[in-house]
Amino acid sequence: MTSNNEKKLLTKSDINKVFWRSFTVNASFNYERQMSQGAQYALSPILQKLYPDKKELGEALQRHAEFFNTTPMLCPFIFGITAAMEEENATQEDFDPNTINSVKAGLMGPLAGIGDSVFCCLLYTSDAADEL
């Protein structure tokens, strides 16, 4: 259990930057890695803050170059968790950075299923029902 008195590296402003950048996640969509470049762009402010060393920053950016695809409207949720895990990785010696991508991959599918159902089906269906 961690103490609430621990000094956090990331501020609310840092998280807000990630939130606003997450809206551009689909801007660099490609068929090889889907939204990974958008994820890198969204997370880059916190990665630059957490890893001032160029080698560590390169490793962090490489970590987020892996395949990433989910409903774009739910990306801020995943990026918030990812930011917290990156902060733990930067401050804890015994943290395994492979868990960051494992958690991202574990959240992509379920959130895509929920997000697609809500944003792509339910909302359009209710809009079509209003037309009747």
State the predicted function of each range.
Residues 1-96:
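Soluble N-terminal domains of membrane-associated systems
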Residues 36-38, 118-123:
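The first (N-terminal) embedded transmembrane alpha-helix
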Residues 53, 99-102, 125:
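Intrinsically disordered, low-complexity regions enriched in small/polar residues
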Residues 84-93, 104-110, 125:
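Short, surface-exposed, charge-dense and proline/glycine-enriched linear segments
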Residues 124-132:
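Single conserved hydrophobic/aromatic residue that forms the stacking wall/gate
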